From Swiss-Prot:
GO terms for cellular component: cytosolic large ribosomal subunit. Pfam families: Ribosomal_L32e. The lineage of its organism: Eukaryota, Sar, Alveolata, Ciliophora, Intramacronucleata. Keywords: Ribonucleoprotein, Ribosomal protein. One of its GO terms (biological process) is translation. This is Large ribosomal subunit protein eL32. The gene is RPL32. Belongs to the eukaryotic ribosomal protein eL32 family. Signal peptide: none annotated. It comes from Tetrahymena thermophila (strain SB210). The keyword Ribosomal protein applies.
Amino acid sequence: MAIKPVAHKKIIKKRTKKFVRFESEDFAKLDSSWRRPRGIDNRVRRRFRGQRRMAKIGFASDAATKHLLPNGFKKFLIRNPADLEILLMNNRTYCGEIAHNISAQVKAALVKRAAELGVRLTNANAKVKVQESA
């Protein structure tokens, strides 16, 4: 039987669009990741009408639903079998995500052990190759 998360408030995002760095689309050398504009004449910093919004604390998530995934769990990174034992007591609050650098053989063992312990995994069926015998 699938593990259900603890009941929580409805997750409401105050803003779903990403905050993009000012003029990052005009210059290839500027990455699009957010940087606060600090220029004395900058129209985004001065909040002129028609300009993009600046990131500020008012856009933050509700504290009760912060870090929640859409499935209702919080994510916990699993790097070895001992990390699964940590989730045993909190399997209704946290779900595991197997780290990207885990080998397929160890990953298969982790998925099997998680099913025994009743721990939910977000990427249980990723990077699983079935070998064909010739």
